[in-house]
From Swiss-Prot:
Keywords: Apoptosis, Host Golgi apparatus, Host membrane, Membrane, Transmembrane, Transmembrane helix. This is Envelope small membrane protein. Isolate N1 belongs to genotype A. It comes from the Viruses. Its main location: host cell. It is a single-pass type III membrane protein. Homopentamer. Interacts with membrane protein M in the budding compartment of the host cell, which is located between endoplasmic reticulum and the Golgi complex. Interacts with Nucleoprotein. Pfam families: CoV_E. It is found in: Host Golgi apparatus membrane. Plays a central role in virus morphogenesis and assembly. Acts as a viroporin and self-assembles in host membranes forming pentameric protein-lipid pores that allow ion transport. Also plays a role in the induction of apoptosis. InterPro entries: E_protein_bCoV, E_protein_CoV. Residues 38-79 are intravirion.
């Protein structure tokens, strides 16, 4: 028959607690890392929304205005100036 002393039992319980705490701490770090990645992706989306999209809109609108202005306004000919 196997004799288990209190010291052996406490050692096994301590090892289990250390293993559980290690898993919990690892889980906390993994969740924090994933949350950081998600936050970075959201910030990149905001960067796109607030910086790139307005500049693309201004560029496209400027091109539209330039084309419409250059099509509508034709420089006068030399006959008109005489």
């Amino acid at each position: 028959m196997v004799d288990l002393f209190f010291n052996d039992t406490a050692w096994y319980i301590g090892q289990i607690l250390v293993l559980v705490l290690f898993c919990l701490i690892s889980l906390i770090f993994v969740v924090a890392f994933l949350a950081t990645i998600k936050l970075c992706m959201q910030l990149c989306g905001f960067c796109n929304f607030f910086i790139i999209s307005p500049s693309a809109y201004v560029y496209k609108r400027g091109m539209q205005l330039y084309k419409s202005y250059s099509e509508q306004v034709i420089p006068p000919t030399s006959d008109y100036l005489i």
